[in-house]
Structures are given as structure tokens and as C-alpha cells.
Amino acid sequence: MAHVAEWKKKEVEELTKLLQDYPVIALVDVADVPAYPLSKMRESLRDKAVLRVSRNTLIELALKKAAQELNDSNLEKLIEHIQGGTGILVTKINPFKLYKFLEESKKPAPAKAGAPAPRDVVVPAGPTPLSPGPLVGEMQALGIPARIEKGKVSIQKDTVVLKAGEIITPQLANILNQLGIEPLEVGLKLLAAYEHGIVYTPEVLAIDEEQYISMLQQAYMHAFNLSVNVAYPTKQTIEAIIQKAFLGAKNVAVEAGYITKESAGDILGKAFRIALLIAQELPEELLDEKTKELLNQQAQVIAAQPQPAEEAEEKVEEEEEEEKEEEEALAGLGALFG
């Protein structure tokens, strides 16, 4: 049996305890993170999480040991996400917030040949500080529309030179670095996170917050409206249900002419409007001065309202059509009765 170094045993024990002490366990890739940025990230995580970098084999042993001692086989599922230079990040922050924090903590970095682009890389249109030279031909060879303007290299239009996931070539890395475009990111890349028996991958954690907030708001409004319409009282809907019932009862009272403290004003207003409509049909000599004044005011209000030209034309056309139909009907009657 091969001898196992004591430091390895101690490391596995410490990692196992760390895994048991926190509800959220994440694996992060630290392979491409330089020492100084990594130390700055440790500082930023100090009050939020604990980062421990170790050998992949020791992390795997610690996960198996912790899963066995916690009687949680799901914890072992993290092992399949170990890759590259892996670190353990333990925290009390839920996986979604942790993922967002790590993504926002990433900093731009210069192009590096052989590295995959984390997202589409765009060379923007406009002048550059670069002087004419062989670089112009290199740009054009890569599909970048470059030419000389006022003694400097100028890009004619925004150009996507690399799609997300594609590998940066040495030629493109040289051009991007001279243009000052930093397509890469330096930061902790979350490989997977575990909480309460569930392993979350980055694809699951990368949610569109605005979209989900909008979906929740819509769901809330639909549930609210359903509760109000079926008169199902809750803390959130009881006020709206009472208001709806009150307005419904009031409308019934107004339509039926049943006078109450709440409906009297609307009933009188309705009666007043009906009275004015009747007054419009009566001969003017039968009206008193007050009624004439009210009718005159009403006519002025109606006249002051703008009438769209299209609606007016349609109305004229409708009237002409009606007159034509009446004339045709009369002609038909005349022919029928000789």
C-alpha cells in the first residue's frame, strides 16, 4: 500500500470540514487567474465566502468523504464538474446571488492567443490612434474594413471578429491588443454550485433578472385579478373586492332609481341628463330661461370638441349613402303602387 503524505491527509480533513460547515458549496476554475488578481478576489470575498484552492484529487476525496459523513450522495455529483485548476468556494449566499457576484467581479483582460472568447468580440467603427503600416493589410485579411484617413487607421464599420466560444488566433490577438480591445475576462469561473441536494450549473444560474421580475409581476397581477373576479378574499385583494362590490351595488341602485346616501348624486345626475335630452326635443317657447341657458352651454361644449376630418368625411359619406338608400326605397315603393 502506497504511503500517503501527512499533509495530504490533513488537507483532505480540512477540506471535508469546510464542506460540512457551509450550506452552499461551489467549484470554481482558478487556472487562468494570475496570483495578484486572485489575492484581490480573496479580499472581496472575505465577508461573503471562503475560497480554498487545492489539488483536484484532494478535492475529489474531500467531496466523497463529506458526502459519506453527511449521508448525502448528491454532494458527490460535484465531482464530475472538477476540471482545470479547481478551487472550493463555500458560502451562505444562495447560488444565484453567488453566480451574479462572481460575474460582476470579473475584469477585462487583453487578448491571448489560444484562449476562447467569452462573448462576441466587436471591433467598433471609428478612428484609431494607429499609424499606417502592415497592420492595415492584416486587418483587411481578417475581414476588418480598415483604411487610412488623416494619417491614421480608421475602421469603417462595427465588425464582429470573433463569436463567443471561438479561439483567438495569434494574428487577431495582435490586432486587438494594438487597438486596446480587451476581449477576455479575469475572474473566478463558476463550474457548479450545490445547495440542499441540488447541483446548479452556470446555464441554470445565468438568469435574466429583468425577464423573471416581469414574469413574476405578470403572474401576480393575473392571480390578483382572478382573486378579485371570483371574490376570493386575501390580504392583498380584500380591499379591491370590497370596492368592486360597492361599485356594483351602487350601479344597480342607480339603474333602479333606488335612492341611498351613496347613489342619490348619480341618480339626480342621470335624471338631469335625461331631462336635458327631452328638453332638446321640445319647442323653444315651452322652455324657461334657465333651461335654454343650460342647453346653450351644452351646445357650446359639443361645438368646441374637435372632430377629426376623416370622421367628418365618413359621416358625410354615411349620410349620403343613407339618403341614396332612402331614395331607392321610395322609388321602389312608387313602382310597386303605380
From Swiss-Prot:
Acidic residues bias locations: 310-329
Alphabetical list of Gene3D superfamilies matching this protein: 3.30.70.1730, 3.90.105.20, 6.10.140.760
InterPro entries (alphabetical): Ribosomal_protein_uL10, Ribosomal_uL10, Ribosomal_uL10-like_insert, Ribosomal_uL10-like_insert_sf, Ribosomal_uL10-like_sf, Ribosomal_uL10_arc
Cellular component terms (Gene Ontology): cytosolic large ribosomal subunit
Keywords assigned by UniProt, alphabetized: Ribonucleoprotein, Ribosomal protein, RNA-binding, rRNA-binding
Covalent S-S links between cysteines: none
GO biological process per UniProt: cytoplasmic translation; ribosomal large subunit assembly
Subunit structure of this chain's protein: Part of the 50S ribosomal subunit. Forms part of the ribosomal stalk which helps the ribosome interact with GTP-bound translation factors. Forms a heptameric L10(L12)2(L12)2(L12)2 complex, where L10 forms an elongated spine to which the L12 dimers bind in a sequential fashion.
Function comment: Forms part of the ribosomal stalk, playing a central role in the interaction of the ribosome with GTP-bound translation factors.
NCBIfam families with a match to the protein in the record: PRK04019.1-2, PRK04019.1-5
Family: Belongs to the universal ribosomal protein uL10 family.
Entries under PANTHER family matching the protein: 60S ACIDIC RIBOSOMAL PROTEIN P0 (PTHR45699), LARGE RIBOSOMAL SUBUNIT PROTEIN UL10 (PTHR45699:SF3)
UniProt name for this protein: Large ribosomal subunit protein uL10
Gene name linked to the record: rpl10
